[in-house]
Amino acid sequence: MGKVYDWFEERLEIQAIADDITSKYVPPHVNIFYCLGGITLTCFLVQVATGFAMTFYYRPTVTEAFASVQYIMTEVNFGWLIRSVHRWSASMMVLMMILHVFRVYLTGGFKKPRELTWVTGVILAVLTVSFGVTGYSSPWDQIGYWAVKIVTGVPEAIPVVGSPLVELSRGSVSVGQSTLTRFYSLHTFVSPLLTAVFMLMHFLMIRKQGISGPL
């Protein structure tokens, strides 16, 4: 094992990377509330893992979506647990995100030179909410259907561009298969990818600038 480690160490300088990570200065005022962002990240990773597991059985069609969710809950080994953890971690992620935003705002973590960190955080907050909106439609039950109909109908109040926006979000004039396909794509691919990118930017900036000092 020593020779294998030395081979990687010679090429990647693993020890230097480890020393940089473990020796980062942590201000003495930091408390448990500064962990809220990390907890949000943990919830996101749980979401990715459980969501990926359910994609093996879920069918994003208006005729099979509800039945496939029922199949996951009743027939798949530990399917009920996987879906329940997915739902619980989704609620926890939203809660932790809100608390994290309040903590950063109240402690002045958005001030110079951390404005861009705050901007990426706000974008991540919007993406977090988008997970809830797009994922709510997945079972395609009565609640999911009418929630999608209401949400996609909101832009109709906007003059001139309202109706085109509604049709764009629904994929047609009315809510149907195109709507479910769009929401499923956003929920399982677009939103997770954007979230991963902005999280990486967010953490790199925190790593570079460090934790903000006390007020």
Swiss-Prot record:
Keywords: Chloroplast, Electron transport, Heme, Iron, Membrane, Metal-binding, Photosynthesis, Plastid, Thylakoid, Transmembrane, Transmembrane helix, Transport. It holds the Pfam family Cytochrome_B. The keyword Hydrolase does not apply. CDD domains: Cytochrome_b_N. GO terms for cellular component: chloroplast thylakoid membrane. GO terms for molecular function: electron transporter, transferring electrons within cytochrome b6/f complex of photosystem II activity; metal ion binding; oxidoreductase activity. The chain crosses the membrane at residues 32-52, 90-110, 116-136, 186-206. The 4 large subunits of the cytochrome b6-f complex are cytochrome b6, subunit IV (17 kDa polypeptide, PetD), cytochrome f and the Rieske protein, while the 4 small subunits are PetG, PetL, PetM and PetN. The complex functions as a dimer. Heme 1 (or BH or b566) is high-potential and absorbs at about 566 nm, and heme 2 (or BL or b562) is low-potential and absorbs at about 562 nm. This is Cytochrome b6. It comes from Huperzia lucidula (Shining clubmoss). The lineage of its organism: Eukaryota, Viridiplantae, Streptophyta, Embryophyta, Tracheophyta. The gene is petB.
